[in-house]
Amino acid sequence: MLAADPASTRPRRAEVLAALSLALDLGLGQPMEHMLRAAVIATRMADRIGMDATERGVVYYAELVSWIGCQADSPELSALFADEIAFRAGTFPIDLRGRNRARFLLGQAGHGRPPLAGGRARLRLLADGRRRMHELLESHYASAGALADRLGLGAGVRDAIHHTFERWDGTGLPRGIGGPAIPIAMRIVHVADVIEVQLRAAGPEAAVQLARRRSGTQFDPQVVAVLTGAADEIFAGLDQQDVWPLALSQAPDPRLALSDPEVDALLIAIGDFVDVKSPRRQGHSRRVGALAARAGQSRGLPETTVHALRRAGWVHDLGRLGVPGALWDRSGPLSSADRERIRLYPYFTQRILGRVGGLAEVAEIAGAHRERLDGSGFPRGVDGSSLSVPARLLAAAARLQSLTEERLDRPAVGLAQAVRTLEREAAAGALDAQAVAAVADAAGQPQPRRRARATGLTAREEQVLALAAVGRSSRQIAAELTISEKTARNHLEHIYTKTGVSNRAGASLFAVQHGIVRAGPPTG
C-alpha cells in the first residue's frame, strides 16, 4: 500500500471512510482493501443497472461500511463463538441456509475451545441460539445505524445496512426479509462482498460460478445476471497491488475535503466505534485524546501539534479491531501467534491512518503509543532516539488512562497509584520522565463540569446508564447502587425508551456522546 499524498493537507471524506473500511476488513478476518475492492465491483454493477448518482453513492458507502456494526456485537458474538473474527471470516465461503447454517454455527461454537467447553457452547447454542442470534443482529443493526448517522452517511445507507444479513430467499436474519423488499443497494452489496473474496482466492471463473450457485438463494438473480454478463469488465484492475486509487475514483464525492471540525467529528466517532468492542473501554479513546492534549499544552507544544496529538489519542487503538476480543480478556498465557497479533495492532493503526492525506503526523504519533524508550515496546521495538515528544506523551497518557480503568483481570486503580506506576516505569527507562510528569499534572487538573442534563434522564438513570455502558449486568448495577435487580431492569427499560436505543452497544455510545461515562481518571 502506498503512502498518502504528502501534498494533501486536508483529509477527504472518501479517504477517511475508506481508511475505516481497512480497519473493518481486519475485524472480518480479511486482508485490508477487501471492502475497497468490493466497492469497485458494487459500483460497476450499479452503473450497469443504470442507477442514478445518489443511488450509486448509497451502494458505494453501504459496501464500505456494511459491517460497521460488527464491533458493537463483538462481546456477545465472542461469548457464542470464542473468536468472533474467525467466525466472520468463515461466513464468506458458505451459503448459510438450512443444514449448512446449522453445521457452520455448531462448528464455530466449539472452535478454539477445549473439548468440554466446546461441547457446552454447542449445547447453549442448541438451547437458545436462534434467540441469541436474533438479539445479536438486532443489536448490530441498531449500532450500525447510529454509527452511520454519526459518519454523515444519510438515510439511504442507514436503511441499506439494516439488511446486511438478510437473503434473497427470505431465510436471512434477523427478520427474514427477502426478495425486492431488500433495498437494491444491499442486494448489490451482498453479491460484491462475497464475490470479492472468491475472486481473490480462486480467480474470475470461480467467482462467477459461485455467483450462479447462489443466485435465487442468497443473491438476487438479476444482480447476478449483471455480474456474470460483464464479469471481465467488472473485475478489471482488481488484481493490481494497490487498489486504493481505483476505489477512491469510484466514490461519489472523491474530492470533498473536510474542515477541521468535520475531521474531528469523524475521528471521534471512529474512536468511539473502536471502544465499543469492549464494554470496559467505553470512552477510553476520548479520554486518552483529552489527557494527551492537556499534557502537550503543559509542555508548551505548538497548538497544531497539540491538535495532532489529541486526534492521535482519539484513534490510537484503531488496529485493535483486528484482534479477537477473547485475547484481550484472556487471563492465562498467550501463544506466540496470539502475542504477535496483539503486538501488531499499533502497526495497523499507523498503516491505516497513513493512507489519509493530512493525517501523516497523527498516524505516526498513534502508531508509536506502545513503543518504549528502552526498546521494549512494540510493534517495531524502536528506542527513544526514534520517538518524538508527542509520541512519548501519548504513550504515557494511554498507559495512565488504562491503569485507571477496570479490566477483566484487575480493578481500576486510583490516580495516585497509577502515577506511581508510571514513575517507576520512567525510572526503569521505559517511559519518558518529562512526559510522565506532564501527563500526571494534566490528569490532576480540575475538569470542566459536564453541562446540565439535556438527555431527559434522571440523575439515577444516568448512574444506571454509566454502569451499563461499561458492561455491568442488572444484578451488578443493583449491587453497586444498593437497589433491587428489578428496579435496575426497570431503569434500563426507561433509559432505552428515552434514548431511543435498544441494546448495550447503543446505550454505551449514547453515554459516551453525552458525557455520562466517567470523563477522567479516578482521583483516589
Regions found by a protein language model. Give the residues of each.
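DNA-binding alpha-helical recognition surfaces that contact promoter or target DNA
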Residues: Q209, A225-V226, R420, A466, ...
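Metal-dependent catalytic cores of enzymes that make or break cyclic nucleotides
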Residues: A4-A454
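Short helix-to-turn junction characteristic of helix-turn-helix DNA-binding domains
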Residues: A468-R472, A511
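Alpha-helical residues within the helix-turn-helix
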Residues: Y61, R311, A479, T497, ...
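Short alpha-helical "packing" element that flanks the helix-turn-helix/winged-helix DNA-binding module
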Residues: A160, V191, I365, E461-V464, ...
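Recognition helix of helix-turn-helix DNA-binding domains
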Residues: G471-G506
